[in-house]
Curated annotation (Swiss-Prot):
PROSITE patterns, per the entry: IGP_DEHYDRATASE_2
Xref: SUPFAM superfamilies: Ribosomal protein S5 domain 2-like
Coiled coil stretches, renumbered: none
Compartments where found: Cytoplasm
Family that this chain belongs to: Belongs to the imidazoleglycerol-phosphate dehydratase family.
Protein name as it appears in the record: Imidazoleglycerol-phosphate dehydratase
CDD domains associated with the record: IGPD
Gene: hisB
Gene3D superfamilies: Imidazole glycerol phosphate dehydratase, domain 1
Enzyme class: lyase
Keywords for this protein: Amino-acid biosynthesis, Cytoplasm, Histidine biosynthesis, Lyase
Taxonomic path: Archaea, Thermoproteota, Thermoprotei, Thermoproteales, Thermoproteaceae
Length: 192
């Protein structure tokens, strides 16, 4: 099974295209939000995946539409690449330090959508991205990926380090969950 997918989404606000392979390789992210580029590149790299993400902002209001739509399309692309999810590990978790910041992330790819984020930032932005968009990105990703995602920022002082520890931990957790373990459906019910 190829474990790759391409998804495009066009709205009156953005155009987003994501090409994703669940094999390691080159990652290229090009959006008008530079800090988002850094975070999405980090996420895909730590998932052990490769791909290209291209987003165009058609309205230019702020970072909200681009961040949200990239998360939606990335989640949809990953969902498509996973197929029927037979044989997946399904669960993944990581606790990642980034200097002063420490973040726990846990993922369940069982098809039930839920999102929980515990943590806070002391600045309104990191670079050109609003810090409120960090949890919103993850919420949007969880919804389109059909996943349960919990993120707990245990502590941190530097806002860049906090955000980066979130995306690294989430990437590693998703990377574990997408591993093929063999066998059937990863559920006692027999279906996801």
């Amino acid at each position: 099974m190829p474990r790759s997918a391409v998804v495009e989404r066009r709205t009156k606000e953005t155009e987003v295209k994501v090409e994703l392979s669940l094999e390691p390789g080159e990652v290229n992210v090009d959006t008008p939000v530079k800090f988002l580029n850094h975070m999405v590149e980090t996420l895909i790299f730590y998932m052990g995946a490769s791909g290209r993400v291209k987003a165009i902002d058609l309205r230019g209001f702020d970072d909200h539409h681009v961040v949200e739509d990239v998360a939606i399309v990335l989640g949809s692309t990953l969902d498509k690449a996973l197929g029927d999810r037979t044989g997946l590990a399904r669960f993944g978790w990581a606790i990642i330090p980034m200097d002063d910041a420490l973040t726990l992330a846990s993922v369940d790819l069982g098809g039930r959508v839920y999102f929980m984020f515990k943590g806070s930032f002391t600045r309104e932005t990191v670079g050109d991205m609003a810090t409120e968009m960090v949890p919103h990105f993850i919420r949007s990703l969880a919804s389109s990926l059909r996943a349960t995602i919990h993120v707990n920022v245990m502590w941190g002082e530097n806002n860049h380090h906090i955000a980066e520890s979130v995306f690294k931990a989430l990437g590693l957790a998703i990377g574990q969950a997408i591993q093929v373990k063999g066998g059937g459906v990863p559920s006692l019910k027999g279906v996801l």
